[in-house]
Amino acid sequence: MAQKKAGGSSRNGRDSAGRRLGVKKFGGESVIAGNIIVRQRGTKMKAGANVGIGRDHTLFALVDGHVKFQRRAEGRVHVSVALPEAAE
């Protein structure tokens, strides 16, 4: 015969792992083509010059250069990659 009463069950106790979203390369940082700049859900930030947008709205660099964030009139942040000045 069991010496313990049956334990109750809990209906909580689950959580999903964080999705690692956010800015990966900040303003002024240098990037090479293909580097991920921002991981996001939806288009919180829009792609500007020399920035591509992935199927999951990830923004990535299309060329080598420096990251630039600009807040536009419509309130959205546009992310672009400025080309490095030619060294002479």
From Swiss-Prot:
Top-level taxon: Bacteria
Source species: Gluconobacter oxydans (strain 621H) (Gluconobacter suboxydans)
Keyword terms, alphabetized: Ribonucleoprotein, Ribosomal protein
Gene name as annotated: rpmA
A molecular function GO annotation: structural constituent of ribosome
Gene Ontology biological-process entries: translation
Protein name as it appears in the record: Large ribosomal subunit protein bL27
One term under GO cellular component: cytosolic large ribosomal subunit
Chain positions covered by the region annotation Disordered: 1-22
Residues spanning the signal sequence: none
Residue intervals passing through the bilayer: none
Family, as annotated: Belongs to the bacterial ribosomal protein bL27 family.
